[in-house]
C-alpha cells in the first residue's frame, strides 16, 4: 500500500498543491462579521423577538455620534449650525433609516387646544440670543426626554443617534460590510463639517464595533499567522536541524489551514473573532503529525548502512509510516474528538469553530501521511545524503557541548535530568495513596473556590482592550451620556378570551365612526374642561361607543381592545376589515389596550422602580414619557391669572412649607423645593406631568374613562418619535420602553430584566405581559447559551475521551482513569479564569475543547507507555521510572511547543485573544502535569488489570488457583 502510494508521489504533490490553490482562491470571499445579531441563532426566541420588535417599532441598529466642545457650552449658533448640516447630510446616506439630534427632535407643544410636534430649535430659529435661551428652556421643560440623550448635564456635548435599516436592498440582514460603508460615509460628512472647529467627535454602536472588529482581525491575521509559523519553524529546526524536517511539517499545516478556511469561505460561513483562532490553533497543534512522521523517517535513515540509495531511502520512508501511522491516526482522532465537542452549541461561531478546526486537524493528518512522504520520495538522493551528513556534523559539534553540560549535571544527561525531575514531582504529589488523596483534595478545594469566582459575560465590547479608542469612546458616552448599551422592554396586551370581549358591531366604516365620535373643535381652557366638547360621550350612534370605548359604555374603556389584521383605512386605527357582515365574517381578535390608565401607571411606576434600583441604567424613555408630556401641555393654564394673583405672606409661607415637606424636609434641596412649588401653582402644567389616573383631578366619573382621554391625545398628535414606542399610533396593543445602559455587564442586564419581570408580575393588571429585547437582552441570552453549550461540550468531550480510551485499553476503568486528569484540567482552567477575573464567554469557551483535544494525547501517550513497561516487570516504581524515561520528556516538549504556539496570541490586538493565548499555555502545563502525576498515582495505587500483559494475567489466575 505504502509502496504504491510512493510511486504516485508527483500525483499527490500536484493534487495537494492544486487543492491548496483552489481553496486559496476562495479566501477572497472571506466575510468578516462581529455583531450580536450574527452570533445569535436566528431560530432562537430572542432573535425572533428582536425581528418582531423591529417590525412594530423600527430598527434597533443604532450608530451614535457625540460632539464635545472645549468651550463652555455646545449650545451656540455656530455649533448648532454644524449639527444641522450633519443631520441633513446623514439623512441621505445609504442604509440610514432615521437620525435624531437637537436639530430635528420633536418638542410637544399645545396649539389652539390641540397638540403639535414642534422642534427644539423652534419654528423660526435664526440663532439669536432669544433663540438660544428658548432652546435651553425647552431642554429643561422636558428633561425626562432630552437630558443625557441629546445633551450632557454640563451642556458641553451633544449626541446624534442614527438608526440604520435592519435589512439591505435584497431583504437580507444588513451585514458588517454595509454597516461599515454607512459608518465611513458618515465619518466623512462629520470630518468635513467639523473642519476648523474645536469639536471632538466620538462614534459608538454596532457599526463601530463591526468596523473595529474588522480592523483588529485583519491586523491579527497578518501578524499572528507569520508569527506562529516562525515559532513552529524555529522549534522544528532545533528539533531536526534539516530543511526537510523544518519546512515540511510547517508547509503541510499551512496547507491544511488554507483548506479549512477556504471551505469556510466557499460555504459562505462568516469569519468571526472566534474563527481567527483557527489558523493559530491548527499551526500550533497540526504540526505534531508531521513531526511524528519525520521523526520515524529519520530513525529509518539511521538504520541505513552505507550509502543512501533510492531503494533504501524509500525503505526508510516506508519504515517511518509503518511504525507511526497508528499512533498518528489515534492522535488525530482524539484531537478531533476534543474540537468537535462544540458542534452541539446553538451559537454558530462556536459551531463553525468546532467543525473547521476539526476539519483542519483531519487535513493536517492526511497531508502528513501523504504529502510529506511524497515530498521526501521525490527529493534527490544527493540532497538527502547532504542534509543528513550536515545534520550528523552538527550533531557532532553538539556532542561536545552536551558532554560539558553532562559534567555540570553530575554525570546525568539532559534527558536523565528531566526524567528525574518529573519523577520527583510525581512522587511528591502522588507517590503514595495518602499523598494522592491529599494532593487531589487540596487541588479540588482551591479549584472549586476559583470556579465559584468565575463570571459569565458575553458582551462583545469586552473583547477590545480598555485603552483602545473604541473602548475609550464608549467609556466617555457611558459616563457622560445615557449610555452606549440598549435594552428594550415590550409591554403588550394579551388576546382576550371570548367571554371577556364584548360583542361589537362591525357594520359601520371607521371613517363614519371617527366623524361621529370626535368633534375636534378648539378649546379655550385645558383638556379637563374640553373633554365634553371634543367628545360626544352621551348620544353616540349604536356601535360607535362600542367601537371606541366612549360614551355611556364606559365599561368599554376597562375592556379596551383593538381588532387585528387591519387593512386599508381601518389599518390606521387598528381595526380589521369590517366590510363583511357580522354574521359571515370571522370574529376579529381582541386585545387588552395600552391606553388603559392602569397599565400605563404600572409601566411608569416600573420605570421609577428600575431607575432607583440599578445604577447601570442611564435613561429610560417610553410611551408613557409622551403621554405625560401631552397631558402636561393640554392642562397648562392658558392665562396666568393664578400666577399673577396677590398672596399674603402667610399664604406664601404655607406654600413654601408645604413644598419643603413634600420635597423631603431636611433631605431636600433647592431644586426639589422649587419643583414642588411649580406643581402647586401648575406652572406650565407641570402638575399634570403624569399618567391621567387620579379620578378626582379629571372631569370623569370612573378611572376607566381616562383611557378615552389618552386616546384623544394620540389622535391629536402626529409624531414620528412616538411611533417608535407604540405599535399603533392611536389604538396600541403594545408599547416599548427604551432602557439606555451605562454598563455592558450581562449580569447587570439579567438583574434589570428579572426585576422588570418581577415588578410586572406583581403590579401589572390582568391581560398584560412584559418581554425584553435588543442587544442587551441578546447578549444576556447568549450568556445562558454559552453556559449550556459549555456544559454540553465538556460532557460530550469527556464521554468521547472515556469511549476512546476504554476501547484502546479494552476496559471502562481505563476510560475513567484517563478522563480524571482531563476533567481536573478543565476545572483548573476555570479556576485560573475565576482568580484572574477572566470571563467565560464565546471565545474563552473554546479553551476546554483545546484542553481535551490536545491533553488526551498526553494521557494516551503516558498510559500506552506505562502498559508497555508494565509488561516487562511487576515493580511498579520501576515501571513508573521507565515510563517517565520513555515518554516524560516527549510529553513535556510537546506541551511546551503547543503552549508557545498559542502564546503568539498574547500579541493580538484583541484582549480576549490574549487571554486565550495565556490560558491555553496554562492548560498545556496543567494537562501534561496531571497526566504525569494523577495517572501514575492512580495506576500504582490500584494496579488495574487492564495494564497487565496476557502472561501476567495468566500467572495471576494460576496463583489464585494454587492458593485455593
Where are these regions (language model features)?
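Pore- and gate-forming transmembrane helices of large, multi-pass membrane proteins
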Residues: 221, 250, 289, 302-345, ...
Amino acid at each position: 500500500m505504502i509502496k504504491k502510494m510512493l510511486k504516485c508521489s508527483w500525483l499527490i504533490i500536484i493534487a495537494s498543491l492544486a487543492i491548496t490553490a483552489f481553496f486559496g482562491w476562495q479566501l477572497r470571499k472571506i466575510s468578516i462579521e462581529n455583531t450580536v445579531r450574527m452570533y445569535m441563532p436566528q431560530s432562537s426566541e430572542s432573535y425572533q423577538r428582536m425581528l418582531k420588535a423591529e417590525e412594530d417599532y423600527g430598527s434597533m441598529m443604532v450608530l451614535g455620534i457625540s460632539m464635545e466642545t472645549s468651550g463652555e457650552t455646545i449650545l451656540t449658533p455656530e455649533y448648532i449650525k454644524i449639527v444641522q448640516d450633519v443631520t441633513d447630510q446623514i439623512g441621505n446616506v445609504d442604509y440610514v433609516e432615521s437620525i435624531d439630534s437637537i436639530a430635528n427632535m420633536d418638542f410637544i407643544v399645545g396649539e389652539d387646544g390641540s397638540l403639535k410636534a414642534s422642534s427644539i430649535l423652534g419654528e423660526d430659529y435664526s440663532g439669536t440670543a432669544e433663540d438660544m435661551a428658548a432652546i435651553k428652556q425647552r431642554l429643561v421643560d422636558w428633561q425626562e426626554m432630552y437630558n443625557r440623550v441629546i445633551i450632557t448635564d454640563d451642556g458641553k456635548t451633544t449626541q446624534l443617534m442614527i438608526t440604520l435599516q435592519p435589512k439591505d436592498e435584497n431583504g437580507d440582514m444588513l451585514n458588517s460590510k454595509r454597516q461599515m460603508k454607512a459608518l465611513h460615509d458618515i465619518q466623512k460628512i462629520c470630518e468635513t463639517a467639523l473642519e476648523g472647529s474645536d469639536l471632538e467627535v466620538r462614534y459608538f454602536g454596532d457599526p463601530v464595533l463591526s468596523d473595529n472588529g474588522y480592523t483588529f482581525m485583519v491586523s491579527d491575521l497578518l501578524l499572528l499567522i507569520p508569527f506562529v509559523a516562525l515559532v513552529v519553524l524555529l522549534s522544528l529546526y532545533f528539533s531536526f536541524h534539516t530543511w526537510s524536517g523544518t519546512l515540511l511539517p510547517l508547509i503541510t499545516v499551512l496547507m491544511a489551514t488554507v483548506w479549512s478556511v477556504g471551505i469556510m469561505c466557499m460555504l459562505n460561513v462568516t469569519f468571526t473573532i472566534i474563527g481567527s483562532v483557527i489558523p493559530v490553533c491548527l499551526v500550533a497543534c497540526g504540526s505534531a503529525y508531521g513531526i511524528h512522521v519525520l521523526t520515524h523517517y529519520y530513525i529509518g535513515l539511521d538504520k541505513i548502512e552505507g550509502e543512501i540509495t533510492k531503494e533504501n531511502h524509500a525503505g526508510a520512508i516506508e519504515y517511518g509510516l509503518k511504525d507511526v501511522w497508528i499512533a498518528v491516526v489515534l492522535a488525530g482522532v482524539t484531537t478531533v474528538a476534543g474540537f468537535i465537542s462544540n458542534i452541539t452549541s446553538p451559537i454558530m461561531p462556536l459551531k463553525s469553530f468546532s467543525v473547521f478546526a476539526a476539519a483542519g486537524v483531519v487535513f493536517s493528518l492526511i497531508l502528513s501521511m501523504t504529502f510529506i512522504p511524497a515530498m521526501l520520495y521525490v527529493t534527490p538522493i544527493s540532497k538527502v545524503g547532504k542534509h543528513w551528513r550536515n545534520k550528523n556534523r552538527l550533531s557532532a559539534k553538539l556532542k561536545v557541548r552536551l558532554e560539558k553540560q553532562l559534567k555540570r549535571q553530575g554525570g546525568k544527561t539532559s534527558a536523565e535530568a528531566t526524567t528525574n525531575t518529573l519523577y520527583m514531582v510525581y512522587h511528591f504529589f502522588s507517590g503514595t495513596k495518602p499523598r494522592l488523596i491529599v494532593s487531589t483534595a487540596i487541588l479540588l478545594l482551591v479549584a472549586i473556590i476559583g470556579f465559584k469566582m468565575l463570571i459569565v459575560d458575553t458582551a462583545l465590547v469586552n473583547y477590545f482592550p480598555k485603552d483602545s479608542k473604541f473602548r475609550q469612546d464608549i467609556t466617555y458616552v457611558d459616563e457622560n451620556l445615557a449610555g452606549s448599551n440598549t435594552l428594550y422592554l415590550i409591554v403588550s396586551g394579551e388576546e382576550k378570551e371570548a367571554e371577556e370581549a364584548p360583542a361589537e358591531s362591525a357594520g359601520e366604516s371607521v371613517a363614519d365612526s371617527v366623524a361621529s365620535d370626535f368633534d375636534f373643535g378648539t378649546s379655550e381652557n385645558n383638556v379637563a374642561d374640553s373633554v365634553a366638547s371634543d367628545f360626544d360621550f352621551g348620544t353616540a350612534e349604536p356601535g360607535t361607543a362600542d367601537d371606541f370605548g366612549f360614551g355611556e359604555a364606559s365599561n368599554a374603556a376597562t375592556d379596551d381592545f383593538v381588532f387585528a389584521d387591519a387593512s386599508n383605512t381601518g389599518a390606521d386605527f387598528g381595526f380589521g376589515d369590517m366590510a363583511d357582515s357580522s354574521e359571515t365574517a370571522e370574529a376579529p381578535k381582541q386585545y387588552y389596550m395600552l391606553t388603559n390608565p392602569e397599565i400605563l401607571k404600572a409601566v411608569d411606576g416600573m420605570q421609577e422602580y428600575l431607575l432607583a434600583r440599578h445604577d447601570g441604567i442611564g435613561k429610560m424613555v417610553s410611551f408613557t414619557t409622551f403621554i405625560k408630556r401631552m397631558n402636561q401641555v393640554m392642562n397648562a393654564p392658558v392665562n396666568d391669572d393664578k400666577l399673577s394673583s396677590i398672596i399674603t405672606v402667610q399664604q406664601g409661607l404655607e406654600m413654601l412649607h408645604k413644598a419643603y415637606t413634600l420635597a423631603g424636609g431636611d433631605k431636600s434641596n433647592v431644586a426639589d423645593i422649587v419643583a414642588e412649588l411649580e406643581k402647586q401653582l401648575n406652572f406650565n402644567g407641570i402638575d399634570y406631568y403624569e399618567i391621567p389616573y387620579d379620578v378626582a383631578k379629571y372631569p370623569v366619573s370612573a378611572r376607566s374613562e381616562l383611557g378615552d382621554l389618552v386616546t384623544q391625545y394620540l389622535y391629536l398628535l402626529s409624531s414620528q418619535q412616538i411611533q417608535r414606542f407604540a405599535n399603533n399610533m392611536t389604538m396600541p396593543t403594545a408599547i416599548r420602553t427604551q432602557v439606555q445602559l451605562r454598563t455592558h455587564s450581562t449580569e447587570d442586564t439579567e438583574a434589570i430584566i428579572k426585576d422588570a419581570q418581577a415588578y410586572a408580575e406583581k403590579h401589572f393588571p390582568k391581560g398584560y405581559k412584559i418581554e425584553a429585547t435588543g442587544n442587551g437582552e441578546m447578549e444576556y441570552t447568549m450568556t445562558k447559551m454559552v453556559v449550556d453549550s459549555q456544559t454540553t461540550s465538556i460532557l460530550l468531550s469527556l464521554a468521547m475521551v472515556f469511549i476512546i480510551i476504554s476501547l484502546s485499553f479494552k476496559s471502562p476503568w481505563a476510560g475513567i482513569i484517563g478522563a480524571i486528569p482531563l476533567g481536573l484540567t478543565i476545572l483548573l482552567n476555570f479556576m485560573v479564569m475565576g482568580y484572574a477575573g477572566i470571563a467565560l464567554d464565546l471565545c474563552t469557551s473554546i479553551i476546554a475543547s483545546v484542553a481535551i483535544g490536545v491533553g488526551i494525547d498526553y494521557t494516551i501517550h503516558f498510559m500506552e507507555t506505562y502498559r508497555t513497561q508494565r509488561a516487562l516487570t511487576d515493580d511498579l516504581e520501576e515501571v513508573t521510572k521507565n515510563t517517565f524515561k520513555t515518554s516524560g520528556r516527549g510529553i513535556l516538549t510537546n506541551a511546551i511547543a503547543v503552549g508557545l504556539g498559542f502564546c503568539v496570541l498574547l500579541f493580538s490586538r484583541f484582549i480576549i485573544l490574549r487571554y486565550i493565548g495565556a490560558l491555553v499555555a496554562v492548560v498545556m502545563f496543567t494537562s501534561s502535569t496531571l497526566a504525569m502525576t494523577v495517572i501514575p498515582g492512580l495506576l500504582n495505587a490500584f494496579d488495574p488489570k487492564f495494564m497487565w500483559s496476557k502472561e501476567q494475567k495468566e500467572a495471576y489466575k494460576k496463583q489464585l488457583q494454587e492458593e485455593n
